[in-house]
Amino acid sequence: PPDVIKWARGWDLAATSEDEKGDPAYTAGVLIGKRRNERYIVADVINRRLSSSDVREIIKQTCIADRVKYGRVATRLPQDPGQAGKDQAQSFMKLLAGFTVKCIQESGDKVTRAEPFSAQWLGLEGMDKGNVDVLIAPWNEEYFNECENFPQSKFKDMVDASSSAFTELESGATYSAPPKDSQLGKSSYWNK
């Protein structure tokens, strides 16, 4: 839609390929836009079982494709606690240099993190619908099934990624260059 004023893609990461044993989790990336009319649109969903190297590749390729198709898109990745999480976050920051990327340690359980997006999805009691539109696409059925069965569903990856994208949209952060003159009286490093 042409009336989207801000885009964010949230990710939920897993690192188990389809051919490994068991029923592993998915890597999910959900793109949500905030529209001028204060509604939201879920415009794209990626949900795949991938090896760790394939996860990195799909995230990079998705950043490239999102920029081409939608312009500026904030990408939000989860950061695990501890040294390994910091190392992975630094690795992603290097891999995605040139894109707007945040690696954030999630707080609270999955249900608590999903509540703000769920509230917009459902709307006020008595309303016919909430404030979230969904682009018609091949991934709709899988996405709706997971959302409708959350939190009892076996997989919660797309819901987690949706919550992350929504939180990023509503974080109040702006993505513009700093002013030419800072309040410290020193010229901005961005001004040459």
Locations of the language-model features?
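RNase H-like, metal-dependent nuclease domains and their acidic two-metal-ion catalytic environment used
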Residues: 1-104, 134-192
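Short acidic-glycine loop/turn motifs at beta-strand connectors
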Residues: 33-38, 122-124, 128
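Short, conserved catalytic or adaptor-binding loops enriched in Gly and charged residues
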Residues: 92-96, 119-127
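Conserved helicase motor
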Residues: 107-110
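Short, surface-exposed amphipathic charged segments that create phosphate/polyanion-binding patches used
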Residues: 113-124, 148-152
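Small-residue (G/S/T/A) turn/hinge positions that recur once per unit in extracellular repeat modules
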Residues: 130-132
